[in-house]
Amino acid sequence: MSQIVTGADPEPFVTPTTVSPQRIFWATWLGWMLDGFDSAMYSYILVATLTELLPASGIAVNHANIGIYGGLLFSIFMLGWACSMFWGWAADRYGRVRIMCLTVLVYSFFTAFCGLSTGIVMFAIFRFIAGFGIGGEWAAGTPLLHESVPENMRVRLAGWLHTATPTGLFLAALVTLMVGSLFGWRGMFFLGILPAFLTIYLRRNIPEPQRRSALAKPAFSALFAKGQAQTTWAAAALLACIIFGLWSSNFWAPTVVATKLAAAGMTVAHAQQMGAVAGLITNVGTLLGCLLMPWITGRLGSRRWTAVLFFLGSLVSVVASYSIAIQLADNLILFFVLLPVLGFFTNGVFGLFTIWLPEMFPSVLRGAGSGFAFSFGRILGAAGPTLIGAVAALLGSYPTAISLLSLIYVIGLPFIALAPETANRALAD
């Protein structure tokens, strides 16, 4: 097994007492919430953005091209995420807070730069770099929370941490509804600079956790050493399934609603607003799933069985929402009714992994392991939006394409058994 070289004998694990757990939680939560806000804006203003940028790039604006290029740009953004495994290793080596600040600066500035785009290529480059920054925030922030709060609060706060994502998505939808038509899509992207101000607070108020291996210099290859490799690959496979499923299902809800209503004669601006409403409703379910996650895992007493529940729930909710409500019944009202259930399972499942994933790795590999699992997941997940756009263009139906690709949750079930059961165990040093 590969050895992890340390610069001194390890000190006992000490939880900081100079900073309240609540302050650490809210600082981490705020970073992830603004992260969600920046990443979600695109799905709410997709139609308006491509309506301007496609002609500027010599591409016709039509239903098929919006699907194809919209999916391609989603995938480019997620490839940026996929390249962000560097941040997790850096957080283990150089500190959680320092690296978290750098990731926030990268994604906030390059999200704002998207508003300066004059064509598809420039926009894609900015989205890729923004994705690179966003992908690293989780790998630094989640270990920071796990290692900085008392054990008796850790699972509860970690489960609630993912409420930041639906809150960010909710805020993005709300801002789109309130000022999207006034600011336009460029103005919406300019708002992405706001998270940069969070770094001032982080650097001044949040210390590095006093970890047992504070002086360790982890080798990235230790993730694949004997005794660790199965956990690493199982975690990566599970993240791949839920990321692919998420980006292939509920993040398309605003676009499905907007394109369906625009095809029925509604103005693009009004259809975009209704798409934002769909996002708001979906996020209500996501928020509920995250809030209940610590309770659900406690009642089931197993991280694995909780994962099985949410994988199967995700599959059923995707098929019910898209195949039954949209494809068979052609009923937008029923679709809106099912959206909270869709959000509860497909996005709420991430609340489980804010608890489970950091528990799978020792402290010196926690950032690298979390970062690798998410990055690997994003590599596969990046194919989801492109496949949705391509299959939808081929079949002439977003709902059919989305339902077909929801089988990813079935593929993921065997990997749950390969991941370690960490329920009722203290966080490993």
Question: How should each PLM-predicted stretch be described?
Answer:
Residues 1-44:
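Cytosolic juxtamembrane N-terminal segment immediately preceding the first transmembrane helix
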Residues 43-44, 229-287:
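Extracytoplasmic gate region of multi-pass secondary transporters
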Residues 46-84:
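Extracellular/periplasmic helix-loop-helix junction of adjacent transmembrane segments
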Residues 82-118:
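Conserved MFS/SLC helix-loop-helix module at the cytosolic interface between two early adjacent transmembrane helices
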Residues 83-95, 289-302:
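Helix-to-loop junctions at the C-terminal end of transmembrane segments
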Residues 95, 116-122, 150, 301, ...:
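Helix-breaking motifs and short loop linkers at transmembrane-helix boundaries and internal kinks
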Residues 105-118, 312-329:
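C-terminal ends and interior cores of transmembrane alpha-helices
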Residues 161-203:
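Helix-loop-helix hairpin linking two adjacent transmembrane segments in secondary transporters
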